[in-house]
Amino acid sequence: MSNLIFSLNATMPIFLTMILGLFFRKVGILDESFTSKMNKFVFKIALPVLLFQDLSDSDFSAVWDIKFVLFCFFATLLSILAVWGLSHLLKERSARGEFIQAAYRSSAAILGIAFIQNIYGNSGMAPLMIISSVPLYNIMAVVVLAVFRPEREEITADFVKKTAKNIVTNPIILGIATGLLWSVLRIPKPVILQKTVQNIAVLATPLGLIAMGASFEAKSAAKNIRPSIAAAAIKLVGLAAVFLPIAVILGFRQEKLVAILVMLGSATTVSSFIMAKNMGHEGSLTANTVMLTTCGSAFTLTFWLYLMKTLAFI
């Protein structure tokens, strides 16, 4: 019973905060415009500042773990390749890009940090997990959505250059890189700067979760519902079932294992829908998968945490 309570204490506050966001949207406290701006603020300011704070305050040599970084990178890469292979079971070629992206692309930044903070009190290994997986998420999302685009256009040098620039200038990546550099150079932080950074960083998790909940659209879309269910099952259960045992065998425990779980088994990020629409896809498969995984992850993540706690891995 204590293990179940531990798991519920880790997951329920996260999802209740998201539900509050949905409630605030329904009663008119938040509207679409404000929610969009809140999402942008969290993505471009609060979340990078939080990551900068945690990394800049830590000893880089103690935080860096090449084994963990490589595992996250290759687990992400193999997950994408496996889902790409499975996508060929879909008859409609134009749906494959959405299926691949929705089945592998986690909300690693907001949910990952929220879970690890909720359990351990700080972002822990989340920044290293993010720097190993998020750039690959973005690169491969562009690739698969371009390759399986309904009105496919040639992938030119300018297209590749623009994509590379977007990845390098990603605010989350910049926050991590700046924090790591600050830690390596051991630059002192004046009290005024430290407190200002803390005041902004503390906004990231609650605002991010509220915005995620407020962005949720429970639209019923019969089209593509079966591949959406398949993508959700892969996202919440399949990838974690394959790679978590490998992570355990390799010796990952505690916050590292929780970070790996979130990378593999958390909900599909809402930004995947935005990217799919902006790259010429219809979007219903992605929207359905975001909806299913957001609802389902409240139960599946609780199950995974309960299982790992019972087995004394966390």
Stretch-by-stretch model annotation:
Residues 1-314:
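Alpha-helical transmembrane segments of multi-pass small-molecule/ion transporters
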